[in-house]
């Protein structure tokens, strides 16, 4: 996995357990001997490991290690199956290291494969065409080592996303069928009921993507006493009524894909759901309801020049955004962005280890690759400076909001070495009460800012304002390295 890479960050890949593998395990009969290995949190010893079947979930930055594991198992005569985002994008590459590959999601193909494997007739390629979660079994959380993860209560109640952004990996993964679909609400609520503790993290690319489903889910969660985090779009935040329902159900922090402050970039990347949306109004609306904001921003789009880093950071600080996640634009194989970059000769290499949103793997239009990488790191440094955290906290209307901002922003980045130490010492469980304590203080509305129905009156939409005035995929988050059956 990426755990063997020099670029590995424990805090990123030790957040969530590998739900994809635990979901596949739910389809197996009760008497099957199943072990889930996640090299992000503990090494895998191959010496005495010779199962009947090894299933490895592959994403781009773990591909090198995943293929090495697959080759090692095959040399021992183990049947190896590979699936995941990277396999679907580059099936010929993956097939060289596997007996079976899965293209697309596995809800329809995995049960067919299990029947074929039991009969000794397993195929080489299984391609998903039927998209439904109607027969999804409960996730085998009993196979996960919860104490090794910072956020053990992660959950996914939908697949895909209703939008078609050019840079998103998920477009390739869900090609050939529905790109967005959900569980039945009752099934989702039952899965939530099976989780202990108060805190939840929805890993769905867009929990608000189907308004009818989201509304029913939030109604069902009222009274559960849960505190939860999720991802949503600017458009969803500005939709009257839906945010209020989410907050009443326990929403305390939202990952929002702002991505860019440039209307030209939004158009080029087909991020139409953000066009002519008032970003500042979305942040105010979340803060008015006591919801913390984790803003996502992507650098390196064609309208970006070297000034984009300072402008973006200043905007985020000025809005009082609690945490920001910055990315270098990365053309993942299988995406429309990759195809454009390849056709234009702008790809610098195909070293998948470096396709990690931290390295410039293409030639930017208006700056050098080195300037793009330097600006990315500078953005992180500037946003998380103590003075910047203080300025962001001061943007809140009340003392409680300012203190929450300071605690969350500082706790997440300024103490990352401490988090890494806790992870390596396998003491992550002691940090969950800290997270729940911070989140329990959210949901309290800023003093002097009673929420009102959203109105655009007097506020110019993004597309008409000057720039001064941005999954999978958590695409990669939540995927483990190997399931041995």
Language-model regions: role of each:
Residues 1-3, 91-93, 212, 264-269, ...:
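Flexible glycine/acidic-rich beta-alpha junction loops that bind and position SAM and/or redox cofactors
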